[in-house]
Amino acid sequence: MFDRQNTLAKTDPQLWAAIQNENKRQEDHIELIASENYTSPAVMEAQGSQLTNKYAEGYPGKRYYGGCEFVDVAEQLAIDRVKALFGAEAANVQPHCGASANQAVFLAFLKPGDTFMGMSLAEGGHLTHGMALNMSGKWFNPIAYGLDKNEEIDYEQMERLAREHKPKLIIAGASAYSKKIDFERIGKLAKEVGAIFMVDMAHYAGLVAAGVYPNPVPHADIVTSTTHKSLRGPRGGIILMKAEHEKAINSAVFPGLQGGPLMHVIAGKAAAFKEAAEPGFKDYQKQVVANAKALAETLIARGLRIVSGGTDSHVMLVDLRAKKMTGKEAEHVLGEAHITCNKNGIPNDPEKPMVTSGIRLGSPAMTTRGFKEAEAVQVGNFIADVLDNPNDPENIAKVRAQVAELTKRFPVYG
């Protein structure tokens, strides 16, 4: 029998200390990594529940194990809630992550060697959309589309390539693209060339749920997403689909790609989907976009170039070449000031992927802790102050103190 008094602090103080230090870091640092956010205590409670003990291969009502009557309730809640949230005909909530969700789509509709289209990683796409080192690039034949001279998606190029190569699958979505995507236009193109149209909305899902970013569901055959990032749930994946594709996708997820689902994570997803359907979530996402715009405008005013000229969403890329600084250097020096971001390639970046000429910034996490436009402007000035004088320890210390003052006013967890 387990004694509930034997907490982690008692049984593994070394691990406990690492977790406590991470908790402190999250409170003390301004989080600007666009793919990160903070989950609610309710989501963490579900994810830390005894549902982690239960194996449940299969789907609600059709399991390969007994004793699934209560995890069936949890999974069905997640399915019903996410369908309602996005207006989807069918949903699978079992993918362990966004990459797994994307792989399931490939497994369902493509054979090795088949041609598909996705956005170039070098111009803002995601590695699962055809990167040479990824399964999608190794096993299939990717045709990449990119950006035009204004650093916006080149739809004419996309249309030309699709008509030439006749891909079996067209993917829309990105990991570092700040503008709105014309899902309707791409959906019409996919129908014209006879392709399955898949949207990876991992970055934009929370904004989509709140109606502040275009919803791809009416236009796409398949929509994949993570459940963290802007959606503010646990780390995991989902697949939304037209009803006609439900059997193929469900079979691809299980038994095609995965075995037992993570029922404690699925419970966390269900909790997050309920939160995302509440009125306050729409207000939150409106603020996410407002904060991103305020941050971008501040950085532009301070002499930094934003790729694509600004943002329509939660994310932006900052071109650092005018500062004679790499993304790697900027990530490090901003980290010293307790501002967390990630180095990121800019379109056609001359630097290596682990160096880069830019950084990616996002507003979801800082908005969760209560920042509004005034604080976003402050953060933009903090960043510019650091990048204007990155080699002065006193300057870094001054900004770090300002960050500490701001984060104390806006705790993540009260």
Curated annotation (Swiss-Prot):
GO CC term (a single one): cytosol
Sites marked Plays an important role in substrate specificity: 228
Keywords: Amino-acid biosynthesis, Cytoplasm, One-carbon metabolism, Pyridoxal phosphate, Transferase
Catalytically driven reaction(s): (6R)-5,10-methylene-5,6,7,8-tetrahydrofolate + glycine + H2O = (6S)-5,6,7,8-tetrahydrofolate + L-serine
GO biological process, one term: glycine biosynthetic process from serine
Alphabetical list of PANTHER family matching this protein: SERINE HYDROXYMETHYLTRANSFERASE (PTHR11680:SF50)
Oligomeric form and interacting partners: Homodimer.
Name of the molecule in the record: Serine hydroxymethyltransferase
Organism: Polynucleobacter asymbioticus (strain DSM 18221 / CIP 109841 / QLW-P1DMWA-1)
